[in-house]
Amino acid sequence: MLIAPKALSSSTLSREELAADKKEAVHYGHCALGKRAVYVGSFGLFSCTHYLPLTRVERVFKRLAVSKGFYEGKAFGTLSYLVVCYDGGKERQCRFEREDELDMMLSAFRSRTSIPVGKN
């Protein structure tokens, strides 16, 4: 691990736990899901620069938006975001280039954790 990811929550993992978990994490786009933490990218440019321990994550869901061209009558596309809610109301979103990768990550959340997936 060249650069250790920064914790977004007040709760953190030890350096050894973090290194082992990130090494075994399954990557989906700029994000990854490990056994102890979810790793999110920064501004869609860098992969896994921040992490949240799964014990602090309250729920995750998919947010869809449309590009500016939709409103101008030009070519448009959908923008897919993974939104992670943590620490009593804080949110972090990570943009995915491919919606199917986001769907695979949400499916992994459903099967590997007890964290609620979807809006309540």
Regions found by a protein language model. Give the residues of each.
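Phosphoinositide-binding peripheral membrane targeting modules
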Residues: 34-73
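His/acidic/aromatic-lined binding-pocket segments of jelly-roll/cupin-type domains
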Residues: 30-31, 50, 82
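Short strand-coil-strand connectors
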Residues: 27-29, 41-46, 87
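Generic, low-specificity signal for short hydrophobic/alpha-helical stretches with a mild N-terminal bias
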Residues: 20, 39, 87-91
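Anionic N-terminal interaction surfaces
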Residues: 1-36
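Acidic, Ser/Thr- and proline-rich intrinsically disordered linker/docking segments
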Residues: 2-3, 59-120
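Short solvent-exposed loop/turn micro-motifs enriched in small/polar/acidic residues
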Residues: 22-25, 43-45, 76-77
